[in-house]
């Protein structure tokens, strides 16, 4: 990430056009073929402005494109729908030059008007996008966020193939934001025709188009013959079957009936799979920029009291929790995961101390504890982890009833101001949208992200830290990189002083695929948030 920041800052200084980086195709890749992927839950939405979980992230990526992209399987930025861009000397104005001949899957040509519409839409509070806060550096964002404007002042259409975006401050993460799903381009007429159901009737410029969605059964993607990246994708068809228990999906993979169990390897079967050389050869693993955590809703007493939140942090036996998932994770006491710029290996956080936790509860006025609810995603191992958390809380007098729900229901409850007192994030644990510490603050801990539909499930707001985050991200020069990371380490330490979360563990990513599939391992465990890059895998 430091190399990316340095190269971006150099571009800002020189104001040179940046051309697309080459991707070397796999020489063994073949065109054609169909695959089947399974999931336990149906997908909540395929609207890029709304979808924000590990399940729909890679699916949305295959249906839509943004101005920027990543070289497949890497953290290296490359232009997407913009074939090049220029940056002003002050680093605040980006001029994107769009590719000619790009079409939406409804047949219409994409233009700069679509870029303007898409960015206006994602930042409009009526859309309730959980990613709206990512665009806070664009001029006019605050007016959009408060409802006093209906379009972003800083986004201008220059001509049909040129769009100019002006920022209100230099932003070291801006090009990465332009590669996020939230920045993907959508056609106005399709959104208006479908209304709130656009996520069920997606129209984009991506490598695939959706041809069927039978709720509770399957979603079908077919190759977009007009895709602007010639020769891609390799697959003709992907069928996503839903309602599949992970253990059953693994059995079907072993029988050759499916190609990818989307929910990964069931923890109860992990030792068995890894102990069988034939099955272990099909496993792809990668350290993930991910943190699993418990949120405490500061809008819901008694979690408005710091001593209560500190007590909960001290009550959780994280070593025991990691054993539930066969040691595929390491306990943590901080927000940022190892490997993320700004991670502080010396920061330990709250130690496991049930006696100290009980003393803090008594100090807060709850010597006998209290009753609350803990929400959890209902697929294994999350209910078992939640039970372990429940037991730890009971030891200090907190009686937490478990609310085991479908993923979409947990996400909905978390986004409401006073619905979910506590949430175990497992299955929805925060994984990096891009490799920068700001991504572990803006969308999940900033004041803006605590609004309706957001992912700040603690509804935590520290305006001083919001200001510090903006100041850190204004450091765009190469010589400021170390200072910027130091600033972010300090911000995260102050977050933990407020204790809105219990960071529990950092988990490695494990997935499997059938032996008939090809493609580099990095495509099945993509390092930039997309679990699987469907655009580049293939049938042998």
Residue ranges: model-predicted function:
Residues 83-131, 164, 252, 302:
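Aromatic- and charge-enriched surface segment that lines or borders ligand/interaction sites
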Residues 26, 172, 214, 218, ...:
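Detector for C-terminal structural segments
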Residues 41-57, 81, 108, 130, ...:
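A structural "hinge/loop" feature
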Residues 38-89, 201-204:
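N-terminal lobe/hinge region of extracytoplasmic solute-binding protein
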Residues 222-226, 286-311, 507:
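A bilobed periplasmic-binding-protein/Venus flytrap-type ligand-binding module shared by bacterial periplasmic
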Residues 208, 297, 303, 327-363, ...:
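Structural transition elements
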Residues 196-199, 225-272, 399:
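Ligand-site clamp/hinge motif
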Residues 71-72, 149-156, 160-161, 167-233, ...:
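Gly/Pro-rich hinge or "lid" segments in bacterial periplasmic/extracellular proteins
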């Amino acid at each position: 990430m430091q190399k990316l920041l340095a190269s971006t800052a150099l571009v800002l200084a020189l104001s040179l056009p940046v051309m697309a980086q080459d991707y070397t195709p796999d020489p063994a890749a073949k065109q054609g073929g169909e695959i089947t992927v399974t999931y336990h839950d149906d997908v909540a939405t395929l609207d890029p402005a709304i979808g924000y979980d590990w399940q729909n992230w890679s699916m949305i990526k295959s249906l839509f494109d943004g101005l920027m992209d990543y070289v497949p399987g890497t953290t290296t930025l490359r232009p997407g729908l913009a074939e090049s861009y220029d940056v002003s000397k002050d680093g605040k104005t980006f001029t994107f030059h769009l590719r000619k001949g790009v079409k939406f899957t409804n047949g219409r040509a994409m233009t700069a008007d679509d870029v303007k519409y898409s960015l206006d839409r994602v930042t409009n509070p009526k859309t309730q996008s959980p990613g709206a806060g990512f665009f806070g550096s664009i001029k006019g964002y605050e007016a959009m966020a408060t409802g006093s404007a209906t379009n972003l002042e800083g986004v201008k259409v220059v001509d049909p193939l040129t769009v100019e975006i002006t920022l209100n401050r230099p932003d070291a993460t801006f090009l990465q934001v332009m590669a996020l799903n939230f920045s993907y381009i959508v056609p106005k007429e399709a959104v208006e025709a479908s209304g709130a159901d656009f996520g069920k009737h997606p129209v984009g410029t991506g490598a695939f188009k959706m041809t069927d969605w039978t709720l509770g059964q399957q979603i079908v993607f077919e190759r977009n013959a007009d895709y602007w990246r010639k020769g891609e994708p390799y697959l003709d068809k992907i069928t996503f079957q839903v309602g599949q228990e992970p253990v059953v999906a693994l059995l079907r993979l072993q029988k050759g009936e499916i190609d990818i169990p989307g929910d990964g390897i069931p923890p109860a079967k992990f030792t068995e799979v890894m102990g069988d050389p034939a099955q272990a050869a099909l496993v792809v693993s990668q350290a993930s920029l991910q943190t699993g955590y418990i949120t405490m809703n500061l809008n819901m007493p008694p979690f408005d009291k710091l001593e209560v939140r500190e007590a909960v942090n001290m009550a959780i036996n994280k070593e025991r929790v990691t054993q539930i998932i066969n040691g595929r994770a390491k306990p943590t006491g901080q927000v940022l995961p190892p490997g993320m710029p700004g991670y502080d290996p010396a920061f330990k956080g709250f130690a496991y101390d049930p006696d100290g936790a009980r003393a803090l509860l008594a100090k807060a006025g709850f010597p006998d504890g209290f009753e609350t609810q803990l929400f959890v995603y209902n697929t294994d191992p999350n209910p078992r982890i939640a039970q372990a958390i429940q037991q730890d809380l009971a030891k200090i007098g907190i009686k937490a009833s478990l609310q085991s729900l479908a993923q979409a229901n947990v996400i909905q409850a978390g986004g409401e101001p006073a619905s979910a007192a506590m949430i175990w994030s497992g299955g929805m644990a925060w994984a990096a949208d891009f490799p920068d510490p700001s991504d572990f603050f803006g969308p999940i801990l900033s004041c803006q992200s605590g609004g309706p539909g957001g992912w700040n499930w603690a509804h935590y707001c520290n305006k001083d830290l919001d200001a510090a985050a903006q100041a850190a991200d204004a450091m765009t020069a190469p010589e400021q990189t170390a200072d910027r990371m130091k600033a972010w380490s300090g911000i995260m330490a102050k977050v933990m002083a407020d204790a809105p979360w219990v960071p529990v563990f950092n988990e490695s990513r494990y997935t499997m695929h059938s032996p008939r599939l090809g493609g580099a391992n990095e495509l099945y465990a993509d390092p930039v948030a997309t679990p699987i890059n469907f655009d580049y895998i293939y049938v042998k």
